[in-house]
Amino acid sequence: SRHQENIDWKVVANEKQDDISIHFAFIKATEGVSTADKNFKKNWQGANSTNIVCGAYHYFIATKNGKDQARNFIKTVELKNGNLPPVIDIEELYGANPVDMRLRMKEWIQMVEDYYHIKPIIYTSADFYNQYLDGYFKDYPLWVAHYFEKNKPRISSPWLFWQHNNTGHITGISEKVDFNVFYGDEDAFEAILIK
């Protein structure tokens, strides 16, 4: 996102730490009803020009109309075969009633799923999930942020991605980055990509 400023994606793609390389990246595309991340186009082109599998995410504002937020994402992001599914990032209520927040999320999810013909991934923290989303949107893949846990995030639902660290360092990016892992093998990873 704009927080990482200039990223050298070719260097990132060749980075290896303890025999672990960067296989995928989620890039912030949009926020709310009208904001596009100022570095999205540059990052999207840069990352897609490497062997890194790319996904785009929308930072969801719980008090704003879900369809308007979906339109913002759709007009900004062109997904192609081999990309990760679109992501809705929900982290705060911003004073919204949880029921209204879930209705707005549902609007975004349905509109984006209809447009891209793939189920979006829901990104949230373990605490937010347990408090407001547990039992809802069960048919959608979950990407959960729960930092510095030993083996896995502490949630009862199955998860697809786990953001386990928000203070990572990667050559090619001057600012701290979030580290994520995929729950599955290479075949399972390939199966979730846009076809």
Question: Positions of the model-derived regions?
Answer:
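Low-complexity, flexible helical/coil segments
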Residues: 35, 59-65, 89-96, 122-127, ...
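Short secondary-structure transition/capping segments
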Residues: 69-79, 99-111, 130-138, 162-178
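Functionally critical loop-and-helix segments that line ligand-binding/catalytic clefts
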Residues: 1-5, 9-10, 137-195
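Generic hydrophobic segment detector
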Residues: 15, 40-47, 114-122, 171-195
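Catalytic domains of cell-wall/extracellular-matrix polysaccharide-remodeling enzymes
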Residues: 84-158
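Flexible, glycine-rich phosphate/dinucleotide-binding loops
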Residues: 34, 63, 129, 151, ...
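Substrate-binding cleft of extracellular glycoside hydrolase catalytic domains
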Residues: 1-118
